[in-house]
Amino acid sequence: MSEPTPQPTPQTTPRTTLVHLLRHGEVHNPRGVLYGRRDGFHLSGLGQKMAQRVADTLGERDITHIVASPLERVQETAAPLAAARGLSVQTDERVIESANVFEGERFGAGKNALKRPSSWRHLWNPFKPSWGEPYTEIAARMTAALHDARVAAAGHEAVVVSHQLPIWVTRLSLEGKRFFHDPRKRQCTLCSLTTVEFEGDRVVRLTYSEPAGDLIPAHARGAAFSAGGAPEEEQP
């Protein structure tokens, strides 16, 4: 009696998962200070409109998981989308703003902390950088959070609400690019989406969009942080 012919093992197609990295909206910051990880900085009225625009844009998508930095401006950005999707926001310390020795300082034309000789000792290594949390550490914590969000929303979509530099460094890491960069050239404006598409656990595509792009003031597009309500001379 002949042996039965072996049957081919069916191939399982990896599930597609989208993780959207969402930057927070405009911050009420009339003194134009670098707020960093400081408490007490909330969305401005315009920032709230930006957050609602994101909720209107993504509200009908297959989003099953929302993660946010613990800082107020990020929680407030996440809230309208969470309400639209009927989800709770999971707070994750790993997607918090990067640490920076210049927190509380101003960088506008009227008063720029970088012009003080006492600040120059922090500027010796822009590749690390010497003034704040190392890029490698930012990338490591953000990437870990990104993959955890992917697992939590496997086969669906997740949103990770974070900050400009952590999102930009994550993108550079995923694209295999060096971390050293000109902050004015980051493609990560207010309430923008950097979307990472996974097949299984493999990154297959990265796209960028600005659902609230028409609401963003021209001066805010190239700024390293938001200063809603600040006079022109105090804008970063």
Residue map of PLM features:
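Acidic, low-complexity terminal tails and accessory targeting/binding regions
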Residues: S2-T17, Q90-T91, E97-A109, V151, ...
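Phosphate-coordination/substrate-recognition cap region in phosphate-metabolizing enzymes
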Residues: P6-Q7, Q11-P14, R53-S119
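Short, hydrophobic/glycine-enriched beta-strand segments
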Residues: L18-H24
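Short glycine/proline- and acidic residue-enriched helix-loop micro-motifs
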Residues: R116-E137, A230-Q235
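Alpha-helix capping/helix-boundary segments
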Residues: R73, P166-I167
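Generic beta-sheet signal
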Residues: V19, H156-Q164
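Loop-to-helix element that buttresses phosphate recognition and phosphoryl-transfer chemistry
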Residues: E26-E76, L81, W131-T143
